[in-house]
Regions:
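N-terminal pre-domain segments of enzymes
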Residues: 1-49, 251-301
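Beta-strand-rich N-terminal accessory domains
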Residues: 1-176, 189-198, 202-211
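Aromatic-residue-lined binding/catalytic grooves and analogous aromatic/hydrophobic interfacial grooves
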Residues: 18, 68, 242-244, 460
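Short structured motifs
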Residues: 139, 162-167, 229-235, 303-305
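Short, well-ordered beta-strand segments enriched in hydrophobic/aromatic residues
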Residues: 177-185
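Long, charge-rich, low-complexity alpha-helical segments
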Residues: 185-187, 194-196, 228, 248-251
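Extended acidic/polar, glycine-enriched regions
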Residues: 210-280
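Beta-propeller domains with acidic blade repeats across secreted/periplasmic ectodomains
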Residues: 257-504
Length: 504
């Protein structure tokens, strides 16, 4: 991203054509994804030359980007020339219906990386529509770890844990993408589809046209094969120990990498998941304002938000939660979480420290057993700070939805915790692809089960909890029901918006 001087405006005007040179510069940076520091990894939908309802998009540096669909862990593409085009999105405009766009130059065959169903590449992947997330006995996204310039993705495939970290290398005129892998022990064989299109395999390398793949491994039994349906497949054998290997991929029509070998990138990724170095070293100090009137039903102090900050973050505050020690966590619509300290009886020195970035619209947070927990689009995320340095080290996918929605207006609202430890949040039905017409979702305390306890909600932009544990909600705008009503929901309730008459 590019830093602006102190005179810059950080909110894009609605009419950029007449907004001056500064706004035009911001528009250009938004179109290539470098207006703001989003962290090295961002969760969002992706459209354009790569498509996903819920993707993890990783900045590899040198204007090179890779993106994974989190429902299948399939790569939807690697591209050069930018990160994502945010110009028509809520990352850049006050109100916008656009989605992050991968409109850049996609590397040929960079979207073939996918795990085989039931461990065999010849197996046909079943149609799971309307779901877009594989069942968890096949694959589960567990979260990701930022570690310096690296992003380490954690997931499980047919019961075996996997750590994967992509890395960029320039070789000749080509871009080489390394997939560094650590696989947990397990008694079942896994198969990873690396490329399509009938490969020519020679030992630990394979070619398809101008595309080349190298396997770097010291593990016996780990090898390439060509499947019956013409795919380049990596066989991963059963093992009693961790398996470390690297798969490097390049596409080069200039043949500048002919007879060259990429650098060895085998790494023990398990050694990088207990906390990395701090990334955001600049804290911001503001001064709050105490309430002055004594003739009010309540007192309202004001905490000043650092609208101008070292990361060009757009501080569209969207959620908050207090820690037991009085610190405040503040989420923003573009995906940041900041920790705010100095909230006391004078507010003379309020300090803002960036804690996390790249979340998908955190619109509700709670501190549960000391861990900051957020509802985002597609999942409930727990943010773990393992080394107590003030930054999240693991973005744990505590609960994954099986129908994440890409609609720009299909929000998940608020987070409440029940007496039994279960979680509740409101999910939009209007402007949504969800097969339920909006509802309150209940997630078990262990994150393994979810149920809808009330449906027929257009945009439930607020939920609450009564002393007896019942859940209240506020819907908006009507849609043939009273606008801005407050309801008490219950299992099997239907609140009138949408097309259902009952919850089956």
């Amino acid at each position: 991203y590019v830093k602006f001087d102190q005179t810059a405006t950080y909110v894009m005007p609605e009419n950029p054509d007449s907004a001056g040179d500064d706004a035009q510069r911001m528009e250009g940076l938004a179109r290539i994804g470098y207006l703001r520091d989003y962290g090295k990894a961002l969760i969002s939908p992706v459209v354009g030359n790569a498509k996903s309802n819920n993707a993890l998009t990783i900045d590899l540096g040198q204007q090179t980007t890779i993106s994974y669909d989190l429902g299948t862990m399939r790569t939807i593409g690697t591209w050069t020339g930018g990160f994502l085009d945010f110009s028509g999105t809520l990352h850049h405009r006050l109100r916008a219906g656009g989605l992050p766009n991968a409109r850049f130059e996609k590397i040929v065959r960079s979207d073939g990386w996918q795990w085989a169903w039931d461990g065999k590449a010849e197996n046909e992947t079943p149609d799971i529509f309307p779901k877009t997330v594989w069942p968890e006995d096949q694959l589960r996204y567990n979260g990701h770890y930022p570690h310096g310039e690296d992003t380490i993705i954690s997931y499980s495939v047919q019961g075996r844990g996997v750590l994967e970290s992509p890395k960029l290398q320039k070789m000749g005129k080509a871009v080489v993408i390394h997939h560094r892998m650590t696989i947990n022990p397990g008694r079942n064989q896994l198969e990873l589809i690396v490329l399509d299109d009938k490969p020519v395999i020679k030992g630990n390398s394979a070619t398809i046209g101008f595309s080349k793949v190298w396997l770097q491994s010291e593990e016996p039994g780990l090898k390439f094969r060509s499947s019956e349906n013409g795919k380049l497949v990596l066989q991963i054998p059963p093992s009693d120990n961790l398996i470390h290997f690297n798969v490097a991929f390049a596409h080069d029509e200039s043949e500048s990498i002919k007879n060259k070998q990429p650098s060895n990138q085998i790494a023990n990724l398990a050694g990088k998941i207990k906390g990395g170095p701090r990334r955001w070293l600049t804290a911001h100090t503001t001064k709050g304002r105490l309430a002055t009137s004594t003739f009010q039903g309540y007192v309202m102090d004001s905490i000043t938000v650092p609208l101008k900050n070292a990361y060009n973050s757009w501080m569209r505050t969207s959620s908050l939660a207090f820690f037991p020690d009085g610190r405040l966590a503040v989420g923003t619509l573009p995906g940041d979480v900041w920790i705010v300290s100095g909230i006391n009886n004078n507010l003379s020195q309020v300090t803002w420290q960036r804690f996390a970035a790249g979340l998908y619209e955190p619109l509700g947070m709670k501190v549960v057993d000391g861990v900051l927990t957020a509802i985002t689009r597609g999942r409930i995320v727990k943010l773990h700070d393992y080394n107590n340095d003030g930054e999240a080290d693991f973005y744990e996918a505590f609960f994954n939805e099986d129908e994440p929605d890409k609609g720009w207006h299909a929000y998940n609202f608020d987070l409440e915790v029940g007496k039994d430890g279960s979680f509740y949040y409101g999910r939009t039905g209007g402007f949504s692809q969800w097969s339920v017409p909006g509802g309150v979702v209940k997630v078990s305390a262990d994150g393994k089960k979810s149920t809808v306890i009330g449906a027929g909600l257009r945009v439930p932009n607020g939920i609450g909890k009564l002393p007896d544990g019942r859940i209240t909600l506020g819907d908006n705008q009507g849609t043939y029901v009273p606008a801005s009503k407050i309801s008490i929901t219950r299992p099997d309730a239907f609140h009138g918006a949408g097309s259902w008459t009952c919850l089956l």
